[in-house]
Design a protein with these regions (language model features):
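Primarily secretory-pathway and cell-envelope proteins
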Residues: 1-46, 67-108
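Short, solvent-exposed loop/turn segments in extracellular or other extracytoplasmic domains
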Residues: 47-53
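Alpha-helical interaction segments
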Residues: 53-55, 88
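Short Pro-Gly-centered beta-turn/loop motif in secreted/extracellular proteins
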Residues: 55-63
């Protein structure tokens, strides 16, 4: 049978760019699930001023979700889940204009 590959849980070669299109600053967290059998966990927290971008370097492999909170009127938004493959050197760009608002206390 196939032997499960261990995830790259330390610094990878790829990066994730988070673009903030909002007219307000955002606070956010980068959540990763390294493997099907592991619990998702926050590995980075960040702050991005209005209309700015931030590049998170040396991201590991796994399934990711970005969760943000707008800071003028607190509303939470979450990205679709996306995957960074093992040994990826790619830059993933995520524009934080996701459609479905969440109550802040359910996300943060």
């Amino acid at each position: 049978g196939l032997i499960q590959t261990l995830p790259q849980t330390v610094n990878g070669e790829g990066s994730i760019v988070v673009q903030n299109p909002h007219a307000t600053a955002i606070f956010g967290k980068l959540i990763v699930q390294f493997a099907e059998s592991s619990e998702p966990m926050a590995i980075r927290y960040f702050y991005i001023p209005a209309k700015q971008s931030l590049e998170l370097f040396r991201t590991p492999s796994g399934r990711f979700q970005i969760q943000i909170l707008t800071l003028d009127k607190p509303i939470a938004y979450v990205s679709p889940i996306f995957t960074v493959p093992l040994y990826s050197t790619n830059r993933v760009i995520q524009k934080a204009d996701w459609a479905f608002p969440h109550a802040p206390e359910t996300v943060f």
